[in-house]
Every structure is written in C-alpha cells, then in structure tokens.
Amino acid sequence: MGLSDGEWQLVLKVWGKVETDITGHGQDVLIRLFKTHPETLEKFDKFKHLKTEDEMKASADLKKHGGVVLTALGSILKKKGQHEAELKPLAQSHATKHKISIKFLEFISEAIIHVLQSKHSADFGADAQAAMGKALELFRNDMATKYKEFGFQG
C-alpha cells in the first residue's frame, strides 16, 4: 500500500504549509480530536481538565503538545514510508507507556485531514486528501505492527 512519488509530493507540499505554523496546526488538530472524540481527552492527564474549546485554545501546553505531535508526524512523513527509525520509539512509547489504541490514531488522522482541508483547501483537493489518507493509513498500519512487537494489541 505504498504511495507513488506523485502522492508523496502532494503530501509533502501541504505539509510544508503545516510547518509554517506547526504549533497552531497542532493545537487545531488536538482541539478537533477532543471535540469529535471526547474519550481521547482521558489519555492526556495534562489536558483532561480542559472542558471547553475556549479553554483548549487558551492552553499553552496544549498548543505546545500539538506542535510536538505534528513535528513527530512530519519527520515520519518526510521519510516517504522508510520511517522505521523514527517510528520505533514512537510506537514503543505509545504502546507501553501511553497505551494509545490504533483507533485513536484513526481519530487523529481524521482530525488532521479535517484541519488541513479547512486551512488549506486550495492545496488540499481530492487528490491530496486521498494521498494524505494513504500516508496516514501507512503510518497507522506500521504503528500497529510495531505495537504487536511490543506486546500491545492496541
């Protein structure tokens, strides 16, 4: 289920736009995740006290963590599927420490696509959305494989 060179170009073109304000995009992604799937908020001790969108928008910690999440994802996307070295420590921490299910990775993938569509509609048409969907599915599938190696069925 690899991506073609053209698909990777579409993914990385829009990702370049994300990187111009990675913390802002990350904050928007996490807020979207928490609003559409409130159960995911329980996995974040640091944020579970945030009940409203205004509280989330005002949280410097949430904005910072959003940047961390998207920076890690960006380093994986830039490897165009050759991301073993970047993926292994991320999978290990998410499997053994944070216990983040693959379902939650699906939810954040949906949030990422929604935020990119709303912020960059001119650069994120149907082809780019499909390519990003494939890239995020590749990421999730590889995370699931690593989870099993760490004994987490996630």
Swiss-Prot record:
It comes from the Eukaryota. Disulfide bonds: none annotated. Pfam families: Globin. Its main location: cytoplasm. The lineage of its organism: Eukaryota, Metazoa, Chordata, Craniata, Vertebrata. One of its GO terms (molecular function) is metal ion binding. GO terms for biological process: removal of superoxide radicals. Monomeric heme protein which primary function is to store oxygen and facilitate its diffusion within muscle tissues. Reversibly binds oxygen through a pentacoordinated heme iron and enables its timely and efficient release as needed during periods of heightened demand. Depending on the oxidative conditions of tissues and cells, and in addition to its ability to bind oxygen, it also has a nitrite reductase activity whereby it regulates the production of bioactive nitric oxide. This is Myoglobin. Its EC number is 1.7.-.-, 1.11.1.-. The modification Phosphoserine is found at S4. It is found in: Cytoplasm, Sarcoplasm. It catalyses: Fe(III)-heme b-[protein] + nitric oxide + H2O = Fe(II)-heme b-[protein] + nitrite + 2 H(+); H2O2 + AH2 = A + 2 H2O. Nitrite binds at H65. Keywords: Cytoplasm, Heme, Iron, Metal-binding, Muscle protein, Oxidoreductase, Oxygen transport, Phosphoprotein, Transport. It comes from Tachyglossus aculeatus aculeatus (Southeast Australian short-beaked echidna). The keyword Transferase does not apply. SUPFAM superfamilies: Globin-like. Belongs to the globin family. It is an enzyme of class 1 (oxidoreductase). O2 binds at H65. Residues 2-148 form the Globin domain.
